[in-house]
Amino acid sequence: MKSIGVVRKVDELGRIVMPIELRRALDIAIKDSIEFFVDGDKIILKKYKPHGVCLMTGEITSENKEYGNGKITLSPEGAQLLLEEIQAALKE
C-alpha cells in the first residue's frame, strides 16, 4: 500500500473528503458508489462496479456475457463496439 501524504479529519457526521487529485486518478465522479472493506485495522475504499456491467457501454442486461475467465463482461452492443475498435486498430 502506498501513502499519498494526505490526512483528513472526520467531521461530526462521520464524513471525510477525498482529494480531487485522487478522485481524478481513480476515475471517481460525483455520485459514484464507493465500497468499503476492512482488513485488520485498515479501511479500504474501492470504486463500486456492479457485477455484470458491460465494460464498453455500462449496460446491465440479461444478455451480457463474460469473457476472459470472467474478467470482461460485454453486452451484445458492447461486443460489437469492441470488435469494430479492434478491427480498426489492426488495419492501422
From Swiss-Prot:
The keyword Transcription regulation applies. It holds the Pfam family AbrB_C. Keywords: DNA-binding, Transcription, Transcription regulation. One of its GO terms (molecular function) is DNA binding. InterPro entries: AbrB_C, B_subtilis_Trans_State_Reg, SpoVT-AbrB_dom, SpoVT-AbrB_sf. NCBIfam families: lp_hng_hel_AbrB (TIGR01439). This is Putative transition state regulator Abh. The gene is abh.
